[in-house]
């Protein structure tokens, strides 16, 4: 049961990140780099002990080969 919860949360995170990363900019709108909150995948999801899996999934969506959470709660992607 616990494993299914972890898998469901990981799939939800991957789906949200995939939708977010594929969003097309509006025509005529200048793209501005927004402030990105760091460590959300590692800090928030560490409560359910899925931080490393969510970080790895996030990095896969970005096109990297995986990732891990640091002691400071930051997600580091491997290229």
Curated annotation (Swiss-Prot):
This protein's GO CC annotations: extracellular space
Gene name of this polypeptide: SMD1
Top-level taxonomic group: Eukaryota
Pfam families noted in UniProt: Defensin_2 (PF01097)
Biological processes per GO annotation: defense response to Gram-positive bacterium; humoral immune response; innate immune response
Predominant location category: secreted
Disulphide-bonded residues: 42-69, 55-75, 59-77
Key word Disulfide bond present: yes
Protein name from the UniProt record: Defensin-1
Signal peptide limits: 1-23
Family that this chain belongs to: Belongs to the invertebrate defensin family. Type 1 subfamily.
This protein's record includes keyword Signal: yes
Location(s) in or outside the cell: Secreted
Species this protein is from: Stomoxys calcitrans (Stable fly)
Coiled-coil segments: none
Entry keywords, A to Z: Antibiotic, Antimicrobial, Defensin, Disulfide bond, Immunity, Innate immunity, Secreted, Signal
């Amino acid at each position: 049961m616990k494993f299914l919860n972890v898998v469901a949360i990981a799939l939800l995170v991957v789906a949200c990140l995939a939708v977010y990363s594929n969003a097309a900019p509006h025509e005529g709108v200048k793209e501005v780099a927004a402030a990105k909150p760091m460590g959300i995948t590692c800090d928030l999801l560490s409560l359910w002990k899925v931080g490393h899996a969510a970080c790895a999934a996030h990095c896969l969506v970005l096109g990297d080969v995986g990732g891990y959470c640091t002691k400071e709660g930051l997600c580091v992607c491997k290229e």
